[in-house]
């Protein structure tokens, strides 16, 4: 029987810092606490890495991240991520599911991307905006470079810190935790006209599967009519939605991930109330515990492997993996390792690198898990 978290309360910055340091100190063999930068008011943007080899990228092991509290008054994600840290630490080595997850995945958890906004927000805020923005009063989820619109707000320190973090690690999968509705929102988040229509990414099928992997473990979310009292007409079949079809978000973080890194990110709305009372928090953990774990497991779906040099057998960095008919190549990391999320099907996959002859393989992906596909390239 897995041990459940007990620390259910709202953690202000100093409490969160104490919590993170405590778990980093108590579980040094599976944790590493680091910061990716500072907020406007110079609070650390902490990340807890949970892995069986903290601080090290293991060749072939995918990297995963959760980001919470990007909007400072949307606090459920922040607390769930602290619960998740506690849960993973306390169950590693005893619970087989947690042990397997931590041994096979390098997990990075950022409980708060907007610690300044959080300090301004108020417990009991249902649908307000106080504390949503950062200290310079900019919305961080409208602050990333956008494919369709020129973002005119100056780039914020929190945004820049996260962008450089995303360029530092080979993240494969991510979720950005928000509040104010109950749905998993997937790319694209906007479209050329800036109107509410379905804006399909090349990996629409993958994103739908990822979104469903979360929503179907959350009974209330999966039912699809989340906030009857606040938004009576809102209906999301199976608790998922294309971002732009719901409403336009130019400058959002999830699309930037997909368009500028190898990482697939979705945005998860965890509940209709943005800052619920502390006594509600155990209920949110209960509703989302399975979803949070199932979503991490999705990082192992699709294909993964190595692109190697035929002469010396070394990994080739920055080789390109492209899948026929899906316009979204991914690149290899320093050991020549790559991960490409895909749904069930048959694919033609090509590995190419500068100065080498490309190699194409036909690959069968089943519904269960990941298939290892290695490529050996010869110099031209």
From Swiss-Prot:
UniProt remark on cofactor binding: Binds 2 Zn(2+) ions per subunit.
Sugar-modified residues: 133, 318, 374
Gene Ontology process terms (BP): peptide metabolic process; protein processing; proteolysis
Top-level taxon in the UniProt lineage: Eukaryota
Keywords on record: Carboxypeptidase, Disulfide bond, Glycoprotein, Hydrolase, Metal-binding, Metalloprotease, Protease, Zinc
Gene Ontology molecular-function annotations: metallocarboxypeptidase activity; zinc ion binding
Residue span of region Disordered: 112-137
Peptidase M14 domain residues: 9-299
Annotated residues for binding of Zn(2+): 71, 74, 178
Annotated EC: 3.4.17.22
Pfam family name, one: CarboxypepD_reg
Annotated catalysed reactions: Releases C-terminal Arg and Lys from polypeptides
SS bond partners: 227-272
One cellular component term from this protein's GO annotations in UniProt: membrane
Basic and acidic residues bias: start-end ranges: 117-126
Enzyme class, UniProt record, top EC level: hydrolase
Transmembrane portions of the chain: none
Cofactor: Zn(2+)
Residues at the catalytic site: 269 (proton donor/acceptor)
Cross-referenced InterPro entries: CarboxyPept-like_regulatory, M14_CPD_II, Peptidase_M14, Peptidase_M14_domain
UniProt cross-references to PANTHER family, sorted A to Z: CARBOXYPEPTIDASE D, PROTEASE M14 CARBOXYPEPTIDASE
Family, per entry: Belongs to the peptidase M14 family.
Protein name as catalogued: Carboxypeptidase D
UniProt gene name: CPD
């Amino acid at each position: 029987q897995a041990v459940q978290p007990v620390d259910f309360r709202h953690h202000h910055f100093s409490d969160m810092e104490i919590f993170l340091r405590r778990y980093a100190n108590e579980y040094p063999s599976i944790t590493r606490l680091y910061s990716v930068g500072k907020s406007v008011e110079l609070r650390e943007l902490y990340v807890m890495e949970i892995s069986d080899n903290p601080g090290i990228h293991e060749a072939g092991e995918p990297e995963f991240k959760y980001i919470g509290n990007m909007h400072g008054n949307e606090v459920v994600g922040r607390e769930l991520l602290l619960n998740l840290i506690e849960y993973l630490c306390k169950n590693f080595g005893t619970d087989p599911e947690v042990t397997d997850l931590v041994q096979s995945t390098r997990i990075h958890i950022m409980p708060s991307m907007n610690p300044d906004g959080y300090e301004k927000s108020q417990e009991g805020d249902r649908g307000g905006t106080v504390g949503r923005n950062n200290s310079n009063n900019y919305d961080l989820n409208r602050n990333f470079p956008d494919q369709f619109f020129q973002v005119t707000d100056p780039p914020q320190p929190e945004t820049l810190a996260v962008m450089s973090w995303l360029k530092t690690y080979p993240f494969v999968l991510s979720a950005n935790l928000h509040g104010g509705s109950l749905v998993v929102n997937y790319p694209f988040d906007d479209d050329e006209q800036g109107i509410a229509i379905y804006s399909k990414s090349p990996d629409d099928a993958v994103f739908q599967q990822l979104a469903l992997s979360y929503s179907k473990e959350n009974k209330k979310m999966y039912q699809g009519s989340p906030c009857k009292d606040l938004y009576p007409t809102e209906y999301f079949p199976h608790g998922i939605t294309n971002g732009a079809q719901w409403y336009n978000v130019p400058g959002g973080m999830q699309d930037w991930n997909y368009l500028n890194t190898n990482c697939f990110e979705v945005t998860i709305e965890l509940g209709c109330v943005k800052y619920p009372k502390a006594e509600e928090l155990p209920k949110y953990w209960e509703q989302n515990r399975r979803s949070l774990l199932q979503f991490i497991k999705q990082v192992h779906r699709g294909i993964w492997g190595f692109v190697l040099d035929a002469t010396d057998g070394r990994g080739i960095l920055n080789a390109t993996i492209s899948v026929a008919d899906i316009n979204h190549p991914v690149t290899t990391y320093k050991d020549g390792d790559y991960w490409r999320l895909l749904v069930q099907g048959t694919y033609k996959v090509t590995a190419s690198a500068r100065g080498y002859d490309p190699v194409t393989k036909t690959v069968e992906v089943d519904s269960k898990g990941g298939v290892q596909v290695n490529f050996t390239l010869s110099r031209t």
